Design a protein with these regions (language model features):
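Extracytoplasmic
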Residues: 39, 57, 92, 110-112, ...
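N-terminal signal peptide c-region/cleavage motif recognized by signal peptidases
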Residues: 19-21
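Short, surface-exposed glycine/acidic/tryptophan-bearing loops
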Residues: 68-121, 143
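Disulfide-stabilized extracellular recognition modules
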Residues: 3, 23-26, 117-215
Length: 215
């Protein structure tokens, strides 16, 4: 059977979210910072699923493979000071994702990606709202095609390059769907939280780059 592959990549930058809470994390290995970012990741996925369920869409299962792909990209962007879907070597995002979220053994395989960074702190509700307020990001989040998701939220007290040496928090969310063939894999389901309450509107979007590729 011919393999179908669909790729969606969307990129969003916002600045100044809850700027009064900004402060150095003390490094990626600081226990408090690690726990806080893990909580942010869990809350973003829970709110994503609550939003999908409220619109009659299935919640997404948390994939360890997509999680690894997302964390890897967030770490690379902070370390090398860039904000793009492409890897630092210029290879397209789906090549990176496929290293973790394999297509081999499946008849269909598709992936998508949303990115966000902020120079301040950000809540899960604000991440979801920023993406929902962007039509292209919203379309990615609410696509009925996706079955799995992974997220990587990382922060650096001083990130160079594009980030100008400022404290920066980067969020990568990778979406995926694969089916058929012999490569079926068991995944765990993230239970959605109730619909999030309204939050203050985030700052204007500074950059948006939607990409759609079909093979």
């Amino acid at each position: 059977m011919k393999r179908a592959m669909v790729l969606f990549a969307l990129l969003l930058a916002v600045t100044g979210l809850i700027a009064g809470q900004a402060g150095a994390t003390g490094g990626a290995t600081a226990p408090a910072a690690t726990a806080r970012l893990q909580t942010l990741e869990q809350d973003v996925v829970s709110r994503l699923n609550a939003t999908r369920v409220s619109r009659g869409l299935r919640p997404l299962a948390l994939s360890d493979d997509l999680q690894s792909a997302a964390v890897s990209h967030s770490r690379s962007m902070l370390a090398d000071g860039y904000f793009e879907h492409e890897s630092r070597d210029g290879s397209p995002f789906f090549v990176r994702v496929k290293r973790y979220y394999a297509a081999a053994g499946f008849d269909t395989w598709s992936v998508g990606e949303n990115l966000l960074y902020t120079t301040g702190e950000v809540s899960a509700a604000q991440v979801i709202k920023a993406w929902l307020d962007s039509p292209s990001h919203r379309e990615n989040m609410l696509s009925p095609a996706w079955r799995e998701v992974g997220i990587g939220a990382l922060q650096a007290s001083s990130a160079g390059g594009t980030f100008g040496g400022e404290q920066t928090l980067v969020v990568t969310m990778d979406f995926g769907s694969r089916s058929g063939g012999t490569g079926q894999k068991t995944v765990k389901l993230v239970k959605p939280k109730p619909n999030p309450r309204s939050t203050p509107a985030p700052p204007p979007v500074r950059r948006l780059l939607p990409v759609t590729i079909g093979v």
